[in-house]
Amino acid sequence: MRTLWILAVLLLGVKGNLLQFEMMINKMAGRSGIRWYSDYGCYCGKGGHGQPQDATDRCCFVHDCCYGKVSGCDPKMAFYKYSSDKNDIVCGGNNPCLKEICECDRAAAICFRDNLSTYDNKYWNVPSETCQVESEPC
């Protein structure tokens, strides 16, 4: 019960797309994005700088780059349309910007699923100085 309360409190600050992204990660990777990816490596959860620490962190790097290419709407606040079945997510709707955000989130959720074996607890809450080297270009 305490865990549900904590999760509810965390989700109060999550708006729009970030909540949808959390749901996609749960669907595709079978785990909570907030719990597993909110403070991982140099790119998962904190914006990002430096070199991705492993394949899982690279999923977040690519996701950040994808969001950086979106124009015309706010990736972290916009609601998009999508449907899901057993093994996939399909982005829908008529708004190209919203569909682009959805595709960014979809690709990251699939990347997390495909790289579950690379997740390493040593990259959880890495010191900020680890991520101070120059970032590679998107």
Swiss-Prot record:
Record-annotated disulphide pairs: C42-C131, C44-C60, C59-C111, C65-C138, C66-C104, C73-C97, C91-C102
Enzyme class, UniProt record, top EC level: hydrolase
Signal sequence residues: 1-16
Pfam families xref list: Phospholip_A2_1
Keyword annotations from UniProtKB, A to Z: Blood coagulation cascade inhibiting toxin, Disulfide bond, Hemostasis impairing toxin, Hydrolase, Lipid degradation, Lipid metabolism, Metal-binding, Platelet aggregation inhibiting toxin, Secreted, Signal, Toxin
Expressed in which tissues: Expressed by the venom gland.
GO biological process: arachidonate secretion; lipid catabolic process; phospholipid metabolic process
Location(s) in or outside the cell: Secreted
Active site feature: H63, D105
Job of this protein: Snake venom phospholipase A2 (PLA2) that impairs hemostasis. It weakly inhibits ADP-induced platelet aggregation when tested on platelet rich plasma from human and rabbit blood (15-25% of inhibition at 5-10 ug of enzyme), and dose-dependently inhibits blood coagulation, possibly by inhibiting thrombin activation. Exhibits high hydrolytic activities toward L-dipalmitoyl phosphatidylcholine. PLA2 catalyzes the calcium-dependent hydrolysis of the 2-acyl groups in 3-sn-phosphoglycerides.
UniProt similarity note: Belongs to the phospholipase A2 family. Group II subfamily. D49 sub-subfamily.
Protein name: Acidic phospholipase A2 Tbo-E6
Source organism per UniProt: Craspedocephalus borneensis (Borneo pit viper)
